[in-house]
Design a protein with these regions (language model features):
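Short, mixed-charge, low-aromatic patches
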Residues: 81-83, 166-170, 187-190
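Acidic, serine/threonine-rich low-complexity disordered tracts
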Residues: 1-154, 192-281
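Anionic-ligand-binding alpha/beta catalytic cores of soluble enzymes and soluble regulatory domains
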Residues: 177-194
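Acidic/charged, solvent-exposed loop-and-adjacent secondary-structure segments enriched in E/D, K/R, S/T
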Residues: 157-178
Length: 281
């Protein structure tokens, strides 16, 4: 999900937060994406039963019919971040991470705004299953350019190429929610030194990333104060296509939400997102 602070005209294919700088789609890519249905603009606007105009069931009945594993997933959540950093001088902006679910369907988005330098919007939609999130559509928009991935039995990349779909694969937006959920439900060890593999599908390819649990840090957040958070650092890919990497801090006291995200390209070029507010239904 990459928001590359290193250059306003360059984004990196290897950042686990995002994929490479969008390019004009090939005819094959345009045809491939055109074959797939467009993602829902809003889960709230979609009839849960899939029939327009059908009366919605009573709330109690709908909850009773939901699979039991949904109880482990949070309700609608919105995190806002203060964005700082450096690129030929100080950077200032804002960011937010959104999570919505309706039954077993989910929608999550990551948005960054650094004024004229960079704007980025990443979205993921798919299903919540007993084994975790199962993305179906991932799209990213960097400035005015948009690219996407469709995930079915296989993964259809932006250029139309189809590749195998690894078990448990996530995308650059869904990874934050999936990792939070695995931590909150005890599926992942938070012990320092733990290595956490995670497949990520992006417009340019599917790669297996490995996050190392570095340890636990005390973060001083603008409004939330001092918060202890687990520090996840990604290892470089075996065949790196650039120096960008994104580190994530998850707070155990705040449902393991990602309270800090730092995107780095070199010692003097970085963006640092610190959680400012958390809203949850």
């Amino acid at each position: 999900m990459a928001p590359a602070p290193a250059s306003p005209d360059t984004a990196d294919a290897d950042a686990p937060l995002a994929s490479e700088e969008p390019q004009a789609p090939s005819p094959a890519a345009s045809a491939a994406l055109a074959e797939s249905p467009a993602p829902d603009e809003s889960l709230a606007a979609r009839d849960p039963g899939g029939q327009d105009g059908a009366a919605a069931p009573p709330a109690g009945a709908a909850r009773a019919a939901e699979p039991g594993f949904l109880a482990d997933w949070p309700g609608d959540t919105r995190l806002t971040y203060t964005l700082g950093g450096n690129y030929r001088g100080e950077l200032h902006g804002s960011a937010r991470v959104l999570w919505q679910r309706e039954g077993t369907r989910y929608h999550t988005a990551v948005q960054l705004d650094v004024g004229l330098l960079l704007s980025m919007h990443l979205t993921s939609q798919g299903d919540i299953t007993a084994t975790g999130l199962q993305p179906a559509v991932y799209e990213e928009q960097v400035r005015q350019r948009r690219r996407g991935v469709r995930l079915d039995e296989d993964v259809r990349l932006h250029n139309g190429q189809r590749v195998a779909r690894p078990a448990g694969v996530q995308d650059a937006a869904s990874q934050f929610v999936e990792l939070s959920h695995r931590l909150a439900t005890g599926q992942l060890s938070a012990e320092p030194g733990t290595a956490i593999p995670l497949w990520l599908a992006r417009p340019g390819g599917v790669d297996e990333w490995t996050y190392d649990v570095v340890g636990e840090d005390t973060l001083h957040l603008p409004r939330l104060g001092a918060v202890r958070a687990l520090h996840f650092r990604p290892r470089p890919l075996a065949k790196p296509r650039g120096p960008i990497h994104a580190e994530i801090w998850f707070a155990p006291s705040l449902q393991y939400l990602p309270v800090r995200i730092r995107i780095t390209q070199g010692p003097d070029t970085f963006m640092d997102l610190l959680a400012d507010t958390i809203e949850q239904q």
